Swiss-Prot record:
It is a lipid-anchor. Keywords: Cell membrane, Lipoprotein, Membrane, Palmitate, Signal. It comes from Treponema pallidum (strain Nichols). It is found in: Cell membrane. The keyword Acyltransferase does not apply. Pfam families: NlpE. Its main location: membrane. One of its GO terms (cellular component) is plasma membrane. A lipid is attached at residue 22 (N-palmitoyl cysteine). InterPro entries: Cu-R_lipoprotein_NlpE. A lipid is attached at residue 22 (S-diacylglycerol cysteine). Residues 1-21 form the signal peptide. This is 17 kDa lipoprotein.
């Protein structure tokens, strides 16, 4: 099992350190036996994904999501060309991979630390990109809109 996970991590370009993290995650991950969940988890660990998501009241929202290897996450949003929201909003929380391979983030705004956690879903497209799917139950973006909801992996 560990050899196949190493091979998968190598295929995804995770590297030796990431491969070691992936192998170790399979021993504690509740979805360790699920190949799709393992693939998603290996691709996301330590990854930073960025893009501009559509918005109704501005040209877009510059979005950066960080999936830390310890299961914590951070999301930073900045509304483009919007004078009423000039500073970025920062959310912190946790992430997990569901059995179906969908990534679920549980986030709370740093300004509202006592507020309930917001849940967001992401779909792994390939080892270098994820698609924002919104809140649970919202459904995937339409085929025409799907390309506008993609975040690409960045180096830092």
């Amino acid at each position: 099992m560990k050899g196949s996970v190493r091979a998968l991590c190598a295929f995804l370009g995770v590297g030796a350190l990431g491969s070691a993290l992936c192998v170790s995650c399979t021993t504690v991950c509740p979805h360790a036996g699920k190949a799709k969940a393992e693939k998603v988890e290996c691709a996301l660990k330590g990854g930073i994904f960025r893009g501009t998501l559509p918005a109704a009241d501005c040209p877009g929202i510059d979005t950066t999501v960080t999936f830390n290897a310890d299961g914590t996450a951070q999301k930073v949003e900045l509304a483009l060309e919007k004078k009423s929201a000039p500073s970025p909003l920062t959310y912190r929380g946790t992430w997990m991979v569901r059995e179906d391979g969908i990534v679920e983030l549980s986030l709370v705004s740093s300004e509202q630390s006592k507020a309930p956690h917001e849940k967001e879903l992401y779909e792994l497209i390939d080892s270098n990109s994820v698609r924002y799917m919104g809140a649970p139950g919202a459904g995937k973006p339409s085929k025409e809109m799907a390309p506008f909801y993609v975040l690409k992996k960045t180096k830092k």
